[in-house]
Swiss-Prot record:
It catalyses: 4-CDP-2-C-methyl-D-erythritol + ATP = 4-CDP-2-C-methyl-D-erythritol 2-phosphate + ADP + H(+). It is an enzyme of class 2 (transferase). HAMAP family: IspE. It holds the Pfam family GHMP_kinases_N. It comes from Methylobacillus flagellatus (strain ATCC 51484 / DSM 6875 / VKM B-1610 / KT). The gene is ispE. Its EC number is 2.7.1.148. Signal peptide: none annotated. This is 4-diphosphocytidyl-2-C-methyl-D-erythritol kinase.
């Protein structure tokens, strides 16, 4: 008898700041950041198979199966572990694609964590993190599974305690090429290393934001609009921007302005989507690895 699909959350993340502190000889940029999980995101659906096949059962628009991070993650884990089982996989998308919110990386991490349990592999967290890094620089954070002070190219992770907060995240419907932003001659690549103490005093920023604001006025407009309610900042390389609020009620009141009025799309110059989310201290699947 065929098993039913199991559903696993794949939470979005935001970068509370992002400094570019240097560049490695291989071209990867060195960074400092704080990553925070949100109680909003995709859902990964997995059904174990007995026949070793790994299949995507529903298409993700714009993502061919061979480059689907979920399929790549499952295949990588299968080869690494020598597991003889397979899986059917599909994703219900909620996290905006190309927003700097880690959607694809989070999906891949949830596949690794879920299959570690479903296939009874009992791989340790550090082993999964190493596998995840080969899929993308953000994947290790989601397997780490806690609010993190991040350094290196994204692989050096240190747990950090953050105050409770609610976030309004808005995303203009535009495409931003992360590669083009990192290749920009205007990008600051030599920001002096900062400290957790400086971050806690908010003496930080997003180095990518200046370049994106210049090249994409829609992001500039979103930041201007959201800053009317609370200090706004871009996540990652955009296009999503966010602001923090002390209460769910305050955040939802701002989100209502996003959803109910034509004012924002007219001001920004394109369609804009938004959501409200509480910051998470831990990934919901963190217990799936030790």
């Amino acid at each position: 008898m065929m098993q039913d699909f199991h559903a696993y959350p794949a939470p979005a993340k935001i970068n509370l700041f992002l400094h570019i502190t240097g560049r490695r000889p291989d071209g990867y940029h060195l960074l400092q950041s704080v990553f925070r999980l949100l109680d909003f995101g995709d859902t990964v659906h997995i059904r174990p198979r007995a026949d070793h096949l790994i299949r995507r059962t529903e298409n993700t628009p714009g993502v061919p199966e061979e480059s689907d991070l979920c399929i790549r993650a499952a295949t990588l884990l299968q080869r690494h572990s020598g597991c003889k089982l397979g899986a059917d996989i599909y994703v219900t998308k909620r996290t905006p694609m190309g927003g700097g919110l880690g959607g694809g990386s989070s999906d891949a991490a949830s596949v690794l964590l879920a299959l570690n349990q479903l296939w009874h592999l009992h791989l340790r967290r550090e082993e999964l993190i190493t596998l995840g890094l080969s899929l993308g620089a953000d994947v290790p954070f989601f397997i780490f599974g806690e609010s993190a002070w991040v350094e290196g190219i994204g692989e050096k992770l240190q747990s950090i305690q953050l105050p409770q907060a609610y976030y309004v995240v808005i995303t203009p419907r535009i495409h931003i090429s992360t590669a083009e932003i990192f290749a920009s001659k205007q990008l600051t690549r030599d920001t002096n290393p900062t400290t957790i103490a400086a971050f806690l005093r908010d003496l930080v920023h997003n180095d990518l934001e200046t370049v994106v604001r210049q090249q994409h006025p829609e992001v500039e407009k979103c930041l201007q609009w959201l800053s009317r309610f609370s200090k706004a900042r871009m996540s990652g390389s955009g296009a999503s921007v966010f602001a923090a609020f002390d209460s769910q009620e305050s955040a939802e009141a701002v989100l209502a302005r996003v959803n109910e009025a034509r004012e924002l799309p007219q001001f920004v110059g394109c369609e804009v989507s938004g959501f409200c989310a509480k910051g998470l201290d831990q990934h919901p699947l963190r217990s799936f690895a030790t």
